[in-house]
Amino acid sequence: MPRKILGVIPARFSSTRFPGKVLAQIANKTMLQHVYERAGLATYLTSTIIATDDERVYTAAKSFGARVRMTRADHLSGTDRVAEVASAENAEIIVNIQGDEPLIDPAAIDAAVLPLVHEPDVLMGTLKKRIEDPREIVDPNVVKVVTDHAGDAIYFSRCPIPFDRDRSADTPYFKHVGLYVYQRDFLLSYSTLPVGPLERSERLEQLRALENGYRIRVVETEYESLGVDTPEDLERVSRLFKASILQGMGNG
């Protein structure tokens, strides 16, 4: 696989619900270090870099040997921050890896990358997972996605899609897993695309691509996204880390 593929982890210190969360400790490492190390296990990433506008994050990343770059502080989204880093790199494919998912599955990263490697006309990709908890279907904080037979997104919504008119028990629902892959040139032009009414209504940035006529390839995964948005989320993830460590000791 000759193409250069760069993983970028946007990492802000400021967070409305949980300031400094990327530097929160989980099993004697910062959350950011866990994300960086997990991303490094992905087979198809040529390299990984952390993008931040905060000296504290920069210093912490350097302390565990990460590649890290300071970016402008005025970016409106993580995508813009990733694009700034991508503009200075010669990678052909860019992966936007969330900095608050310390359990990110390297295999999920690889699965999202592959379509853009094999089909250069696919400009953007992401992931979906089948919903198992019925409560998530009606939860507006869980973004749903429907795709066509080729696996390209038809729509993303906070509403239950599709609408199950006959209340069929076997209607599958899928939630969006927020890892994005871009062909570099498309990423660099993304912020110049006009924002449409669907993106404004749903408050979902990925709808900008669909509203402007671009495909998004959506790969199904078994990876259960466990993002850390609150101190309570951190406690839950910390318990999972402790359980996995104890399990590993028991198997040793």
From Swiss-Prot:
Keyword Transferase: yes
BP terms from Gene Ontology: CMP-keto-3-deoxy-D-manno-octulosonic acid biosynthetic process; lipopolysaccharide biosynthetic process
Source organism, top-level taxon: Bacteria
Its EC number(s): 2.7.7.38
Compartment annotation: Cytoplasm
Alphabetized UniProt keyword annotations: Cytoplasm, Lipopolysaccharide biosynthesis, Nucleotidyltransferase, Transferase
Root EC class: transferase
Signal peptide residue numbers: none
Keyword presence, Transferase: yes
Gene3D superfamilies to which the protein is assigned, alphabetical: Spore Coat Polysaccharide Biosynthesis Protein SpsA, Chain A
Molecular function via GO: 3-deoxy-manno-octulosonate cytidylyltransferase activity
InterPro entries according to UniProt: Cytidylyl_trans (IPR003329), KdsB (IPR004528), Nucleotide-diphossugar_trans (IPR029044)
Stored SUPFAM superfamilies: Nucleotide-diphospho-sugar transferases
Pathway: Nucleotide-sugar biosynthesis; CMP-3-deoxy-D-manno-octulosonate biosynthesis; CMP-3-deoxy-D-manno-octulosonate from 3-deoxy-D-manno-octulosonate and CTP: step 1/1; Bacterial outer membrane biogenesis; lipopolysaccharide biosynthesis
A Pfam family matched in the record: CTP_transf_3
Major place of residence: cytoplasm
Catalytic function, reaction form: 3-deoxy-alpha-D-manno-oct-2-ulosonate + CTP = CMP-3-deoxy-beta-D-manno-octulosonate + diphosphate
Cellular component terms (Gene Ontology): cytosol
Function: Activates KDO (a required 8-carbon sugar) for incorporation into bacterial lipopolysaccharide in Gram-negative bacteria.
HAMAP family: KdsB
Similarity-based family: Belongs to the KdsB family.
Protein name (record): 3-deoxy-manno-octulosonate cytidylyltransferase
Organism: Solibacter usitatus (strain Ellin6076)
Origin organism lineage: Bacteria, Pseudomonadati, Acidobacteriota, Terriglobia, Bryobacterales
